[in-house]
UniProtKB/Swiss-Prot annotation:
Organism: Mus musculus (Mouse)
Repeat listed as a keyword: yes
SMART domains hit by this protein: IQ
Name of the gene this protein is made from: Iqcf5
Keywords: Repeat
Domain IQ: 11-40, 67-96
Keyword Repeat applies: yes
UniProt xrefs under Pfam families: IQ
Protein name: IQ domain-containing protein F5
């Protein structure tokens, strides 16, 4: 082994070291590029998922608002129907009483005169009954069973 062979070995080993360093640099560059690309894709995916979650949240809120509105509307319709039903029964009772009083006054030679007025949740009834020389005046205020 002479000096030529030893310098050839050192040149070869130096070339191998340079090539290994260069391959390592290329590999690190490729890995860095792949990692950055993966990071960009992950950021984009997280953004898409946040948008989808926001959309789902808005849709759930809108559905809740629609259901709540429907429940309130249904309750108000039921209350309206119930109050109207009671009001119609009360009016029917007033009409029946009026018919009987008129029939009675016609058959006893007296007369009944009166009126009724409905204000808000009150029924004001004013009746004047005359039978010959006797007279009776009735005024009554009845509160209707309307809940507010």
């Amino acid at each position: 082994m002479g000096p030529e062979k030893s310098t050839a070995m050192t040149e070869t080993s130096a070339a191998v070291r340079i090539q290994a360093w260069w391959r390592g640099t290329l590999l690190r560059r490729t890995l860095l590029h792949a990692a950055l690309s993966a990071w960009i894709i992950q950021c984009w995916w997280r953004k898409i998922m946040i948008m989808l979650q926001g959309k789902k949240r808005r849709m759930a809120l809108e559905l809740y608002a629609r259901k709540t509105w429907a429940i309130v509307k249904l309750q108000s319709w039921f209350r309206m129907w119930h109050i109207r039903h009671r009001y119609c029964r009360l009016l029917n009772a007033v009409r029946i009483i009026q018919v009987y009083w008129r029939w009675h006054s016609c058959h006893t030679r007296g007369f009944i005169q009166g009126n009724y007025e409905i204000k808000e949740n009150r029924l004001n009834i004013q009746l004047e009954i005359s039978l010959g020389s006797q007279a009776c005046k009735v005024e009554q205020c009845i509160t209707l069973p309307i809940k507010e």
